[in-house]
Every structure is written in C-alpha cells, then in structure tokens.
C-alpha cells in the first residue's frame, strides 16, 4: 500500500554500502582503461606488440598470486590472524599502486635490454646484459618499498595492515620471480619476435 511517504536511509553503514557498490560497478572499467592505456604506451615506447602483452600478463600473474596470498592470510586466518574479510577497497588500491610500480621496473629493465639490442647485440645477449645491469637497482628499489610498506603489517588497524602486506608481497613477487626470472625467460623464448611491430617502418 502506498502511504505517500518517501523513506531514505542514512548513516555510516549506508554510506559504506554506496561506496562499495560504486567500486564494484566501476572496477572493471577502471582495470580495462589501465590495461589498454598501458598497452598503447608500451607499444609506442618499445615499438613492439609482444613487450606490452608480456608486461601486462606478468603484472596480472603477480597480482593474482598476491591476492591469493592475501585471501590465505586474512580471509582464511593464518599466521596468527583470525579469519575475517578483506575490505573491498584494498584489492583496488593494491592493484593500482602495484601495477604502476611493476610497470616502472618493467620499463627500466626492457629499456636497458632494448638499448643493447639496438647496438647490435643478439636478443639473448641483450637480455643478459640488461638483466645484469639493472638487477641490483631493481632489487634495491624493491627492498626499500618492501620495508616501508611491510612496516604497516605491525599496525592493529586491519585495512592498513592488509594494504601494507599486500603491497609488500606484490613487490617481492614482482622483483624476484617476475622481473628476474620470468621476464628474461620470456624474452629469450620469443627471441627477435620481442621487437616485432606489424606496421613498423624500416
């Protein structure tokens, strides 16, 4: 029965629900924009199709592993923590921050490899030289980020703890397994196809 009265809900709970709904509705669009823009920028920068595809794939792989570990620790309750929930905003923040940092490491490494390749080195030799010359810098930068964000793990505020642990884990995975192992392996696997661009001139 229509009573002619409008009901409106307010309060912190309603506010939180609206925020979560907005994130859930727009997160896929945001991720798509990030991935497409990253692909275009890297394709233009390195004049390659394979390099940006590989970079995006490696980032998604590392972030997927990170989210799995976060669920294992915080949602299932391990390492002395009670089972709980992961705040919805946490994966979004971790994705955006880590995706940017990981791409920074990727550009730094691939730029050095490309520099050697353009000098006339084979793809394999360029990959080895690029890795050797950048591994210490990438590892040092990653360690600084891990220490800074890892310190958040000691707070009692759960969202802050989750952000700190998530970023620290993601950077650790990216700087070791991804950047120093998988990326060079893929570079060697694809060989000269790494630098292929269908409409490249010359």
Please identify what each model-predicted range represents.
Residues 1-51, 58-72, 76, 81:
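Structured non-transmembrane domains adjacent to transmembrane bundles in polytopic membrane proteins
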Residues 25, 29, 58, 128-140, ...:
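Alpha-helical transmembrane segments of multi-pass membrane proteins
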Residues 31, 35, 64-72, 101, ...:
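Hydrophobic alpha-helical segments of membrane proteins
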Residues 39-42, 59-60, 82-106, 147-150, ...:
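Hydrophobic transmembrane alpha-helices
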Residues 39-43, 132-196:
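Hydrophobic, glycine/alanine-rich multi-pass transmembrane helices and their short helix-loop junctions
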Residues 48-57, 76-94, 154-169:
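Membrane-water interface of transmembrane alpha-helices in multipass transporters/channels
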Residues 52-73, 162-180:
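Small-residue-enriched core segments of transmembrane alpha-helices in multipass membrane transport
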Residues 97-136, 148, 152:
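Cytosolic juxtamembrane regions of multi-pass inner-membrane proteins
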């Amino acid at each position: 029965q229509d009573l002619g009265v409008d009901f409106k809900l307010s309060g912190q709970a309603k506010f939180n629900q609206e925020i979560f709904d907005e994130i859930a509705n727009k997160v896929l669009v945001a991720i798509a924009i990030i991935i497409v823009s990253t692909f275009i920028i890297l394709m233009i920068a390195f004049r390659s199709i394979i390099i940006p595809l590989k970079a995006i794939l490696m980032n998604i792989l590392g972030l997927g592993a990170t989210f799995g570990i976060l669920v294992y620790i915080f949602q299932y309750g391990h390492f002395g923590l009670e089972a709980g929930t992961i705040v919805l905003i946490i994966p979004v923040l971790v994705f955006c921050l880590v995706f940017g940092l990981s791409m920074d490491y990727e550009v730094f490494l691939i730029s050095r490899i490309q520099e050697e390749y353009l000098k006339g080195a084979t793809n394999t030799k360029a990959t080895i030289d690029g890795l050797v010359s950048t591994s210490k810098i990438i590892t040092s930068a990653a360690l600084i980020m891990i220490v800074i964000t890892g310190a958040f793990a000691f707070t009692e505020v759960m969202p802050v703890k989750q952000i700190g642990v998530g970023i620290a884990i993601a950077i650790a995975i990216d700087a070791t397994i991804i950047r120093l192992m998988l990326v060079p392996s893929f570079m060697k696997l694809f060989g000269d196809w790494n630098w292929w661009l269908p409409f490249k001139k010359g």
